[in-house]
């Protein structure tokens, strides 16, 4: 079987990967979390574009699927963990104990393996999507460096554990995927998008962590409401 490596979608995926590598360098070697944020954002754009291009061009291959997973591990696993490590050290944490935040990489790998095998994620995500997790930490790093803000070092470790568990949680998280563009059936998506765009327009990057936390909270509340309404089977 002949494998095509350099298709246009695969080139976009490689751009995603390289953007993630740049984010790691900015976070760990240059200690520039503002540039690291932009690199993660660019990686997320390429991550969207490669899938869009593959569907548009009807180019799908096993190579593309595997390459996408490998790129995501760097851009949305290693890069945010590197940013979190830099935050931990910058706020007074010990360099060696800061290794604990890289639990995020391990759980990102578990999340990827689960996503690749779980067929229930066509219309919604099961657990927190990796790009959302990555953008949360990237934007927090950007804000903290730009405003010279500080936090207890232990907060970085706690955050890494909480978000690691969210990555592999069984909680359905709504996806911004539209089967149609009618408001009926897409109420939550349109309302969330509208509020998010307003907040981004007003507060730019500073709004991102709150938007992502709101996304998580709304998804959890939605899950609990659904579970409360589901019929209980009596013995």
Predicted regions and their residues:
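Multi-pass membrane catalytic core of lipid/isoprenoid biosynthesis enzymes
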Residues: 9-15, 56-113
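Hydrophobic alpha-helical transmembrane segments of polytopic
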Residues: 12-15, 36-43, 100-107, 133, ...
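Alpha-helical transmembrane segments of polytopic integral membrane proteins
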Residues: 21-24, 42, 46, 80, ...
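Topogenic membrane-insertion module of multi-pass membrane proteins
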Residues: 1-51, 200, 222, 232-235
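C-terminal membrane-associated helical module and adjoining short loops/tails
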Residues: 126-235
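Helix-coil boundary and interhelical linker segments in multi-pass alpha-helical membrane proteins
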Residues: 22-39, 78-102, 139-156, 201-206
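Short, amphipathic, aromatic/basic-enriched membrane-interface segments that mark the entry/exit
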Residues: 2-11, 65-70, 122-129, 175-186
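C-terminal ends of transmembrane helices
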Residues: 50-61, 107-123, 168-177, 220-227
